[in-house]
Amino acid sequence: MSKIVGHELCVPLEGGNLYDDLRVDIESSHRQLDREPRIQNQRQGIWIGNFFKLNFSRASVLLGLTESLALNGFRRKWLLEFHAYWRLVLNGRTLWGVSNFFALAHEYRKKQQHVEGLNWGSPSAHLKNWQHPSELYSTFRMALKDALLIKRGLLLPRIWNKVPRHAKILEYGCSLAPYYSTYRQYFSHLRCRWVLADIPNFPFHYAKIRYWNDPAVEFLTIYEENFQNPLGGERDFDVVILKEVLEHLDEPLFVTELLLSRLKTGGLFIFDYEKSDALGLDHPKSLGMRKEVLALIIGQVEILHGDVSDLDSSIGFCIARKL
């Protein structure tokens, strides 16, 4: 974890408690964090070290050890990192082991259930939907997914063998930044530069804390004031990652067109597009514009991995190259 900690990096809301009803003004917390200086000192790995870590993790996944070791508390790094964030930044009460983590995750998940339609009428409303205190559950969920290597497909060479050394990579709508996390652990010998971009939500705050001092990373927070121009002057990416994002966007066609325009010719475009019911945090406009968005993508890329033949169904993990 980054060395940046402190309760001043978390702006509390009134009410609740510091255990199973912690209430955070997450946008103000992001703005407070963005004012902090960065001391970029994280060391990057070497190839041989990354090689051994990668193959050990691959073997652990294949043998079914990853999940059991994490769930039983034998693999503890993920839990210690989360606990440091929970205690030293969010000011939560001490977690006594992995059982406390799961008990709390269950409590926050119950609060997070959406039983009524959400208001998507403006950028401000869009952000507020993701910033409700109950959405703290998403940090628990993403931390656990990271620990269990649920996105274990990220360990496969089909992605990283295609990424050039010294690439500039955008992980858009990154949440806890699973692609950067994988790169940091296993592929940092590629010496890439990263831009992690998302709205000021709960998992992205944890991602910033984790990677604040990493020299390979820049953070791009999409507030209401830059909602219509989310990338600013950032351009010339070698890789753009848009995973588990499109179904949540209010303007998926605009965002996709923007991202493709900032991707170099020959660059990699990694994406998927779930066909959801447009409930909860899945945006109704994104469901209505699926075919138009997918047609835009297909018209500008060559699909290297994945299947986009059935536009009426969910589109799974795809790797494409911009034409």
Model-inferred region functions:
Residues H248, P252:
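Di-metal (Zn2+ and/or Mg2+/Mn2+) metal-binding site signature of metallo-dependent hydrolases
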